Amino acid sequence: MSGNSIGQNFVVTTFGESHGVALGCIIDGCPPGLELTEADMQHDLDRRRPGTSRYTTARREPDEVRILSGVFEGKTTGTSIGLLIENTDQRSQDYSNIKDLFRPGHADYTYQQKYGMRDYRGGGRSSARETAMRVAAGAVAKKYLKQVHGIEIYGFMSQLGPICAETIDLDQIEQNAFFFPDASKLEALDEYMRELKKSGDSIGAKISVIATGVPVGLGEPVFDRLDADIAHALMGINAVKGVEIGDGFGVVTQKGSEGRDLMSPQGFESNHAGGVLGGISSGQPIIAHIALKPTSSISVPGQSMTAQGEMAEVVTKGRHDPCVGIRAVPIAEAMLAIVLMDHLLRHRAQNQDVRSHTPVLGMR
């Protein structure tokens, strides 16, 4: 299997399966001298890990990361950083009854057809369990971005099913299990999820992720545009079926006079483009949104077929998230951080000495 790495200068490679011995990743290209301990990654891993809310999977994994290499006396050495998380709460027997059954909406059928075999235990490599290592690697990138360049990244759930955030209070995001920025909707979210769990069904969500302090100039047109790489990284998250940069699909109904981000010596008047113009960062906040589908691992009976081509009823048992978006916020943050880190290093390699006489614009 190829496709396990992302990045050119800051390269993250992950390995491991949902019910395997462990998950791991290798980070190549991290600059030397960055102070780094397991605690720097553990915070984001705890935000993502299962079993922390009654509305996420009951699988209880501590997700304690270990640094295997690339750090000496508390600082990165510039060599490959090896990270490992052991799997400790697998219940593979939950999947024995579906080992020859394709779960609709999952990668079971496509993995079987592509590779001629598959690890049916929790989805194997296709499981979102793998994203724990992306979060760990993203935490390294986030620390460097903030400490060296003043770039901060944060995400939140902007919609769960029919419930949308109408106000954005950043102080609220970490104060509730939904990473929801609108406190007035928390009771409605709680009630909605209670009824959803009773029905045995699942629901989709929309996650927003923002990076502030990004300098002008990141992005390598034409085929390595910054927004293209961001979309690629975010689309690679399990269950993501749509990505928007800036106003996204909202531009369809905009007129040119409405959607352009007017400029003056005092700064930009708006940010419809989401911080990227012509594939290059404009210095405004990078704004992206992702749409996550409802998981197909539900207890509502459905029709499927076996590996032998026979019709069968499927009822997925096991421990699953009724809304995968609840744990997706730190994953989206991590993927945006990895892309920005990679492009910062690429920009430094080629354009570090470039000086423009045009003043740098901010927001009015």
Swiss-Prot record:
Its EC number is 4.2.3.5. Its cofactor is FMNH2. It catalyses: 5-O-(1-carboxyvinyl)-3-phosphoshikimate = chorismate + phosphate. Pathway: Metabolic intermediate biosynthesis; chorismate biosynthesis; chorismate from D-erythrose 4-phosphate and phosphoenolpyruvate: step 7/7. FMN binds at R125, S126, S127, N238, A239, G278, K293, P294, T295, S296, S297, R319. It is an enzyme of class 4 (lyase). Reduced FMN (FMNH(2)). GO terms for biological process: amino acid biosynthetic process; aromatic amino acid family biosynthetic process; chorismate biosynthetic process. Keywords: Amino-acid biosynthesis, Aromatic amino acid biosynthesis, FAD, Flavoprotein, FMN, Lyase, NADP. It comes from the Bacteria. Homotetramer. Belongs to the chorismate synthase family. This is Chorismate synthase. It comes from Shewanella baltica (strain OS223). The lineage of its organism: Bacteria, Pseudomonadati, Pseudomonadota, Gammaproteobacteria, Alteromonadales.
